[in-house]
Regions:
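Surface/interface-facing alpha-helical segments and adjacent flexible terminal/loop regions used
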Residues: 1-157
């Protein structure tokens, strides 16, 4: 079976076939083109995962800042505990990902900028506030995003 056929019919087998070729030093037999494509795809997946976690984290921080006070006044028992758990979980997931792939840290500022528009859209939809009420750029510093004690001061909006 050719490398292309193995790739199309048994991806897992193709991976281990190429791993074995690398171990044996059979560099000419390695399916370089598809291997490069897969490695690039893995890098993109890691960036996409980071952005996904940032979207949720920033959206919940925005919800906390822009609606916690209003909901707490409407429902006396509302303390935002589920929001806090979501914020904590996203921080943990992002930290885990950065620990596993430290080179992603160099992409963090760009990832926050790329995530912000989607985070605003998510927060806006969930708490039914106009997108125009949110800041045009992420109002949180990188340090604040990962500070386990940071929860933005609720606005009066």
């Amino acid at each position: 079976m050719t490398a292309q056929n193995l790739y199309n019919k048994d991806f897992y087998g193709w991976i281990y076939h190429n791993i074995e070729l690398i171990r044996l030093g059979q560099w000419e037999a390695i399916d370089k083109t598809l291997l490069i494509e897969e490695l690039e795809s893995m890098a993109k997946r890691d960036k996409h995962e980071l952005i996904s976690h940032l979207i949720i984290l920033i959206a919940y921080l925005l919800k906390w800042q822009f609606q916690l006070k209003q909901l707490s006044q409407t429902w006396i028992e509302f303390e935002g505990k589920s929001w806090k758990r979501s914020i904590d979980e996203q921080r943990k997931q992002i930290q885990r990902q950065l620990n596993m792939s430290p080179s992603l840290k160099s992409y963090l500022l760009q990832a926050v900028a790329e995530s912000y528009e989607d985070a605003v859209a998510l927060a806006s939809k969930e708490i039914q506030l106009s997108i125009t009420l949110f800041p045009p750029h992420c109002p949180y510093a990188i340090e604040q995003l990962f500070d386990e004690d940071f929860y933005p001061t609720p606005d009066d909006k």
